[in-house]
């Protein structure tokens, strides 16, 4: 039986595939957030985004550097014909991601309560606990994404991102809707709503919002499960197209322990650099919520007069989360352009790593210039237009 041949994507083709997937994901995100905001309210969005702001930096530390490291090492090994190394890199990467995923998940569980206390927002905990397992599934998913990126095949990453976003949309809206319906039915029957005794509809909604946000967070977790299932099935069905002949003719591979050390050595600086932006968002989240708490404590009447229409039907205890949710809504489109330009960097890694491995300086130069040129073509008009 004839062995399969590989079809590697060029730098720009790979960037195009990832960019299109990013646009689709962003469109799905808009479709998701508009009905979600209408469903769980601005107060619920405040809880959801507060939980998400803790999730992102831990997620970044857990897996930001590892996919890049795997992509880099796989592409170098492929360029130099070390096909046995490629197989070992995948196995080592999966073990590393499994360990890091477990540690990241435990870290988020441990940090959840201190974070809620520092933000003076204990009701955010249900959403935090529900979104926490997403770190584990994201880590497992990223082991496949980094591997296929290193093979210069961006399609699995792109398609899994669309599956993940679609799962987030469907499960997030369904779970949030179910929680709201359940809580409201309890109120109509005169029962407690999530452990709270309520006197009217406004108090019932106040009790429902934290758990409705947790329902939305369940969409994030289940979306990562959907993306992971797709990648597992894809790998079992199609594999990586490295042939038996290539494996037989490949040189003796590096030891797994050496490969693991190289992955970690490469991943740490990348993860730390990625962490800076996420930590800034976390600090912003804690600082803004604390300042809102302080402002509301002494100026509640002024704020209610200032936003009389918007705060109608909002309990005093929920004003802070309403204002924070309003702030979060304004940021929904902020990361669109950085997300698009980031795909260029991701698609460039295997091309640059392979060129570096074979000392092809001309290809390195052309690849870097191509990335910078396309980035400028995208970023400059958008910067001027948004400015």
Q: Where do the language-model regions lie?
A:
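Interfacial/gating helices of multi-pass transporter permease domains
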Residues: 37-57, 209, 258-266, 289-334
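Interfacial transmembrane-helix starts/ends
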Residues: 12, 49, 82-99, 260, ...
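Signature of the first transmembrane helix
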Residues: 10-68, 105, 109, 135, ...
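Alpha-helical transmembrane segments of multi-pass membrane proteins
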Residues: 110, 118-144
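N-terminal membrane topogenesis motif
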Residues: 1-28, 84, 88, 250-270, ...
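Short membrane-interface helical motifs at transmembrane helix boundaries
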Residues: 103-125, 383-387
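Helix-loop junctions and terminal segments of transmembrane helices
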Residues: 64-79, 330, 341-358
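Membrane-interface junctions at transmembrane-helix termini in multi-pass inner-membrane proteins
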Residues: 139-161
């Amino acid at each position: 039986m004839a062995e399969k041949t590989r079809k590697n994507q060029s730098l720009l083709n790979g960037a195009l595939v990832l960019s299109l997937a990013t646009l689709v994901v962003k469109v799905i995100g808009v479709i998701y957030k508009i009905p979600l905001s209408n469903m769980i309210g601005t107060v619920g969005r405040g809880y959801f985004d507060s939980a998400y702001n803790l999730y992102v930096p831990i997620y970044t530390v857990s897996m930001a550097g590892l996919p890049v490291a795997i992509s880099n090492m796989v592409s170098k090994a492929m360029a130099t014909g070390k096909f046995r190394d490629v197989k070992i890199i995948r196995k080592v990467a999966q073990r590393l991601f499994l360990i890091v995923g477990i540690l990241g998940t435990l870290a988020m569980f441990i940090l959840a309560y201190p974070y809620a206390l520092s933000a003076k927002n204990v009701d955010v905990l249900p959403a935090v606990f529900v979104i926490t397992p997403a770190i584990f599934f994201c880590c497992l998913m990223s082991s496949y994404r980094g591997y296929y990126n290193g093979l210069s095949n961006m399609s699995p990453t792109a398609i899994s991102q669309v599956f993940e976003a679609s799962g987030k949309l469907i499960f997030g809206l369904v779970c949030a809707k179910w929680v709201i319906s359940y809580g409201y039915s309890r109120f109509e029957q005169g029962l407690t709503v999530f452990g709270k005794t309520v006197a009217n509809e406004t108090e019932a909604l106040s009790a429902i919002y934290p758990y409705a946000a947790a329902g939305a967070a369940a969409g994030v977790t289940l979306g990562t499960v959907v993306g992971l299932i797709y990648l597992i099935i894809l790998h079992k069905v199609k594999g990586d197209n490295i042939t038996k002949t290539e494996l037989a003719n490949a040189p003796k591979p590096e030891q797994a322990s050496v490969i693991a050390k190289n992955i970690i050595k490469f991943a740490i600086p990348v993860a730390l650099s990625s962490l800076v932006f996420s930590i800034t968002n976390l600090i912003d989240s804690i600082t803004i919520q604390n300042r809102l708490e302080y402002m509301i404590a002494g100026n509640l009447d002024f704020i209610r007069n200032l936003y009389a229409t918007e705060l109608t039907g909002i309990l005093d205890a929920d004003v802070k989360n309403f204002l924070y949710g309003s702030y979060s809504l304004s940021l929904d489109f902020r990361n669109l352009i950085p997300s698009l330009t980031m795909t260029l960097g991701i698609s460039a890694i295997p091309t640059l790593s392979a060129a570096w491995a074979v000392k092809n300086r001309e290809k390195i130069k052309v690849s870097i210039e191509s990335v910078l040129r396309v980035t400028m073509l995208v970023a400059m008009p958008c910067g001027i237009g948004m400015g």
